[in-house]
Amino acid sequence: MSRVAKAPVAIPAGVEVKLNGQEITIKGAKGELSRVFHKGVVIAQEDNQLTFGPREGVANAWAQAGTARALVKNMVVGVTEGFTKKLVLKGVGYRAAMKGNAVGLTLGFSHPVEHELPEGIKAECPSQTEIVLTGCDKQLVGQVAADIRSYRAPEPYKGKGIRYADENVRSKEAKKK
């Protein structure tokens, strides 16, 4: 049985929460997020906190309630503080630059790669080898970072490619004759 759902989610000052059946909308300084949850989850707002529980007669309702609580907690953090992912390019000639609402990448292909950013995601390139993605939706920030990384994932021999700033790429030894 999940114990995650038993802890309430605190609603900080400046955050507005609207409950409409199974849909919850959270509005804060960084933006607005909305999500519809499983029918087996009971969401209640009491004072400045949200509580989660299972609905009777629904299989795996505690698991769904724990998932809903974790997602709402991330939504609250997203609209107050936001989420950031940092990518680092490593390799000779690998560069990144902003081109309007897209990230332009030079990754050793015969053509430059342009990754269009979805609405709600901001990117900046503090240097030619760094990309910093920010947004209020944790899932979307992570997905965009994974999409950009997939153009040239780090290879294990020289470590060339796009990696997360906190990623540790294990290197292999070259084949011996």
From Swiss-Prot:
Keywords for the protein's UniProt record, in alphabetical order: Ribonucleoprotein, Ribosomal protein, RNA-binding, rRNA-binding
Molecular function GO labels: rRNA binding; structural constituent of ribosome
Superkingdom as given in the UniProt entry: Bacteria
Transmembrane stretches, start-end: none
GO cellular component terms given for this protein: cytosolic large ribosomal subunit
SUPFAM superfamilies on file: Ribosomal protein L6
GO terms classed as biological process: cytoplasmic translation
Assembly information from the UniProt record: Part of the 50S ribosomal subunit.
Cited function: This protein binds to the 23S rRNA, and is important in its secondary structure. It is located near the subunit interface in the base of the L7/L12 stalk, and near the tRNA binding site of the peptidyltransferase center.
Family (UniProt): Belongs to the universal ribosomal protein uL6 family.
Name under which the protein is recorded: Large ribosomal subunit protein uL6
Species of the source: Vibrio cholerae serotype O1 (strain ATCC 39541 / Classical Ogawa 395 / O395)
